[in-house]
């Protein structure tokens, strides 16, 4: 699964996801893409599950680009532990996705296979998405 090799700080504030995506809102690599419509935190496991669903449907043809990276550590405290006594340890890594962000791109397969692969990937993600095509730009 994806996670940074090293970080400047071990833990991070939760924060909020405000506004629209500044960059990464256009297709750069593939012909078809999956664009986020709502703000959400996508975990490394969800990214991997979406990638596996796409590559399995495409039968290892074509090419998949993952345009997001989980760089935010999410902490949790153990079960049945009282409040206080410091922040919990890092549980998993996540990526804060803003509306308008292209998360996945596909190329090298026909349109029917690409749309179905992206639909299957969207089922694995907590974000509402829409499929975009390069000809739309």
UniProtKB/Swiss-Prot annotation:
InterPro entries, per the entry: Ribosomal_uL16, Ribosomal_uL16_bact-type, Ribosomal_uL16_CS, Ribosomal_uL16_dom, Ribosomal_uL16_sf
One of the record's GO molecular function terms: tRNA binding
Pfam families on file: Ribosomal_L16
GO biological process: translation
CDD domains: Ribosomal_L16_L10e
Keyword tRNA-binding carried by entry: yes
This protein's UniProt keywords: Ribonucleoprotein, Ribosomal protein, RNA-binding, rRNA-binding, tRNA-binding
Record-linked Gene3D superfamilies: Ribosomal protein L10e/L16
Gene Ontology cellular-component terms listed: cytosolic large ribosomal subunit
Keyword RNA-binding applies: yes
Subunit description: Part of the 50S ribosomal subunit.
Family, similarity comment: Belongs to the universal ribosomal protein uL16 family.
Chain's role: Binds 23S rRNA and is also seen to make contacts with the A and possibly P site tRNAs.
Protein name: Large ribosomal subunit protein uL16
Encoding gene, per UniProt annotation: rplP
